[in-house]
UniProtKB/Swiss-Prot annotation:
One of its GO terms (cellular component) is extracellular region. This is Defensin-like protein 176. The gene is LCR65. Its main location: secreted. It is found in: Secreted. Keywords: Antimicrobial, Disulfide bond, Fungicide, Plant defense, Secreted, Signal. Disulfide bonds join C27-C66, C36-C55, C39-C60, C43-C62. Residues 1-23 form the signal peptide. It comes from the Eukaryota. Belongs to the DEFL family. One of its GO terms (biological process) is defense response to fungus.
């Protein structure tokens, strides 16, 4: 019984680690084949203001929140609608 329990510990640890890493990483959008001149302006042209522009290996990189992060306020909105209907 102890051997069966110990064989489950490692996969469970990896599942927890992968779940946490996926939640904490930001989204990267590479603007490849473009030099780093005016990188911030290029990020503002294609992405929202919440993105940060940096230069990596002579390529402009726009880093910021994932599109899924915008869904969180929508949940609060639906909650308020439900409260309005019930009142």
């Amino acid at each position: 019984m102890a051997k069966a329990t110990s064989s489950l510990v490692v996969p469970i640890i990896f599942l927890v680690i992968f779940a946490l890493v996926e939640q904490n990483t930001g989204c990267f959008d590479y603007d490849v084949y473009q030099p780093c001149d005016h990188c911030r302006e290029r990020c503002l042209k294609y992405y929202p203001v919440t993105r940060k522009a940096i230069c990596r290996k002579n390529h402009c990189v726009c880093i910021g929140p994932c599109p899924d992060d915008k869904a969180i306020p929508d949940v609060k909105l639906f909650k308020n609608v439900k409260e309005q209907i019930l009142s």
